[in-house]
Design a protein with these regions (language model features):
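Catalytic binding pocket for nucleotide-activated donors in carbohydrate/polymer assembly enzymes
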Residues: 223-229, 254-330
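Hydrophobic/aromatic beta-strand patches that form the interior of the parallel beta-sheet core
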Residues: 20, 42, 60, 88-90, ...
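Short glycine-rich, flexible loops that bind phosphorylated cofactors or substrates
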Residues: 67-69, 164, 258-259
Length: 334
């Protein structure tokens, strides 16, 4: 979303407005190069970033991490009087969970809180966030504008990560290889799914290929998963717009990236074999979005039911039976 907004503002900025994109030096070189063709880029590791931070009138971000709104970190008390910006929060994704303990006004002081759905917006207004109706606006996610269609016979499996599998990440490097990963229910479920003979047989029969993409935090565990003639296990960077465009259907669990796929009106199957533990371990609570009644596809709680749903879906050429829910959630699909 940040790149989409930066591109638009750089092209349409009124006189006197100076948009600057902040990024880390460890970002992919092609991403940095692409951003520099759009406008001015500054690295958050540099002192220049802190200068621009103190000069900013507005900070627009899809991240609400502490560094986004406090570049001076532990030196904040010495500079707080120079913090004169309004924080516009684009959201990392659709806010379907209750993040009020984290995103409330007293913690993040969001000036404008962008939303995608009517229920999403109302949950924030009615919840413990303490934002007014005027501060919560429905715009959709900027990245929706970059979505496109190029549908092929491809099944995309894209699950979220698990906070409970703490050995597979750390706070600094994000992703580290964890020897115990193969003993987790998470690994056993998804490795079982991409190697299930009933599913593979149906995909071969119908001419489908599969793509399994791990969350970036679990990326180093790709070597644990068994490849076969149907499924490829992605080993690195994922161009989400490309895989969304090319996939006919998606399997995911709790990832809000499913809303991007649903925006394309393509079918989704949710795999929530660990629902109770997931919400006990994550940093947010269940919110307004009930997958069983609001979700854009069936919810499966075990491997057999997931395979059954996918076999039926592929047998019916991935026809979306949940299109009404999609159209009811999104205010505008253009």
């Amino acid at each position: 979303s940040g790149e989409v907004v930066f591109k638009y503002i750089s092209k349409h900025a009124p006189e006197g407005v100076r948009p600057i994109f902040n990024i880390g030096r460890d970002a992919r070189p092609e991403v940095i190069k692409r951003l520099k063709t759009l406008g001015e880029v500054v690295y958050y590791e540099d002192e220049l970033f802190k200068f621009y931070f103190l000069m900013a009138d507005k900070i627009i971000s899809s991240s609400a991490g502490e560094f986004t709104i406090n570049a001076m970190e532990k030196d904040r008390p010495y500079f707080i009087d120079l913090y004169n910006f309004d924080f516009y929060f684009m959201n990392h994704g659709v806010n379907c969970g209750d993040c009020s303990n984290w995103l409330n006004k007293f913690n993040k002081n969001i000036h404008i809180f962008f939303n995608t759905g009517v229920k999403e917006r109302q949950a924030i207004i009615d919840g413990r966030y303490d934002y007014t109706e005027d501060q919560c606006v429905i715009t959709g996610l900027p990245r929706f504008d970059a979505l496109y269609e190029d549908t092929r016979k491809q099944l995309l499996i894209l699950p979220s990560w698990r906070r409970s599998i703490s050995g597979a990440y750390d706070e600094k490097t994000s992703s580290v290889y964890f020897d115990g990963f193969v003993e987790t229910d998470y690994f056993k479920f998804y490795n079982g799914l991409i190697n299930d003979e009933r599913l593979l047989s149906k995909m071969r029969e119908k001419g489908y290929k599969g793509l399994f993409c791990l969350h970036p935090i679990f990326m180093k565990q790709y070597v644990d998963f068994q490849n076969n003639d149907v499924f490829d296990v992605n080993e690195g960077f994922v161009d989400y717009n490309k895989v969304f465009a090319e996939s006919a259907a998606m399997v995911t669990d709790y990832s809000t990236i499913a809303f991007d796929f649903a925006y394309l009106k393509k079918p989704i199957v949710y795999t929530q074999f660990d629902q109770k533990q997931f919400y006990e371990d994550q940093v947010y609570d269940k919110g307004f979005f009930e997958y069983e009644t609001d979700g854009f596809g069936p919810v499966c709680y075990d491997l057999d039911s997931a395979v059954n749903e996918l076999v039926e879906l592929i047998d019916n050429d991935c026809k979306n039976k949940y299109i009404d829910r999609v159209e009811n959630f999104f205010v505008n699909i253009d």
